[in-house]
Amino acid sequence: MLIRKNLFKSFPQASHSQRKKIKQAFYQHLCDLLAESIKNISISEHELKRRFKVSNYSVLNKLYAEGKDVLLVSGHYNNWEWMITAQNLLLKHQAAGIGMPLSNAFWNKKLNERRARFGMKILNANNLQNYLCSDHPKPIATLVLADQAPGDSLKSYWMNFLNQKTAIFFGCEQLAHQYDSAVVYFVINKRKRGYYKVDFQLICDQASDMYYGEITEKHTKLLEKAINKHPEYWLWSHNRWKRHIPENLTELKTEQQAKFEKRFPNIKKKVTQEIKQEINSENPKLARYAKF
């Protein structure tokens, strides 16, 4: 029922048969993921590197040479678990990953042991700040899967995603500004069953050069593009749209932006068309906006 509902709202123009075809393809892919998750328990370093490859190292190698920490952002698309496990084998940066602990302590420990066995550092709300603020022998690449429903609709970034108003996790953008990290989007492409290739795309190397919301808008739209191309590879079984749209959304967005720009005063500011016109007419009252 949830999968059918998500597909209907995301692809309202598609026919019933088209959505049914996507659902069937998703179930087939989900079976592959389950088998690959079991394989992930015992897969060797050699076998994982043979099955999971990088298509372009240049983006991250340049940032590594510059000593830049990176936020790697994507969603639950294709085999994200293999990406988590393989990241420290594939990239020069020290791998780290942010996630919510499972409610079952036993399975949470087992899952994180599998994820961390090749060097991935597992982070959560309790150890994130200490780890990112500590000194490290090499730059860090912190992986964030930012497509799950946020915990609080009033602290989310609201935007259109898959044809509907959606609450987006805003933590990635906050971390980028707080720790002066570069932001890189990654997409995992399925070459064939059990074989993947990850592609990296730079969103920004300097968060302060981006407008409020621009980082979030960009990585979300890139994920949306991937989903529209191959919808069967996204996790449709997640209750993505369970947050209700706030009644005062316009006022909320204005307040959120004001607070964010106060916290990070060096962020690039948007200038409305009206202000630009008055600046161009040399209105002295608006001289303070010229630096934007």
Residue ranges and their predicted role:
Residues L30-A35, S58, M83-T85, Q94, ...:
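A broad, low-specificity signal for short, low-complexity segments enriched in glycine/proline
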Residues R4, I84, L111, C172, ...:
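Generic structural marker for isolated residues within well-ordered, non-membrane alpha-helices
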Residues E66-N126, G151-Y157:
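Catalytic core of membrane glycerolipid acyltransferases/transacylases, capturing the structured
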Residues R50-V54, N104, I122-A125, K165-T166, ...:
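A conditional alpha-helix N-cap/helix-loop micro-motif detector
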Residues K21-Q24, K62, L90, N126-F292:
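Non-catalytic C-terminal accessory region of glycerolipid acyltransferases
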Residues M1-S74, N108-E113, G119, F264-F292:
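Membrane-anchoring hydrophobic helices of lipid-metabolizing enzymes
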Residues K49, V73, M100-P101, L162, ...:
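A generic secondary-structure micro-motif detector
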